[in-house]
Amino acid sequence: MKLPGIVTPLIAFVAYAIAQATPNYTSPLDVDIYNPSQLFNVSGPWSLMSRAGNTLYISGIRGFYPSNTTLAPVGRERVLQAFLNMKMLAELGGSDLTSCLRLQVYVTDMYRWRPLVNQVQEELWKDVAPSYPPRTILEVQRLNDDDIVEVEGTFYLGD
């Protein structure tokens, strides 16, 4: 699998961020809300992930580079970056791809982007799991900033 050249420096950046991971807020019912600004800056009134019990919920993530928040080039690289961003958040929250319970993918053109989503998912999961998590892929009219793909995931954290 060939990954963009930004991945190596990004791994060091993420390792630092993981060490710093603490919830931004914990609700009275023990739901932890995370908004790790050292990785991503959110663009509205939402958070990147939450943890309730042994389940981690990651909000819709797009294909931008965390180091400078610019979008990856349109096409395969952007789809890959969206999945890598979700993967980084899962790892930050204490999980990984092998513990993905469910994926939801939004694309603006099923015909153009679904094959790339399938290709990227096959590449990322081929060495980590014997099968793939349940996934729903939906075509939507428009995404934030006229993007082409957004990925969200639910992950198991163990007992």
For the regions a protein language model found, what residue spans apply to each?
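N-terminal presequence-like segments and the immediate start of the first folded domain
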Residues: 3-84, 88-93, 98-101, 107-159
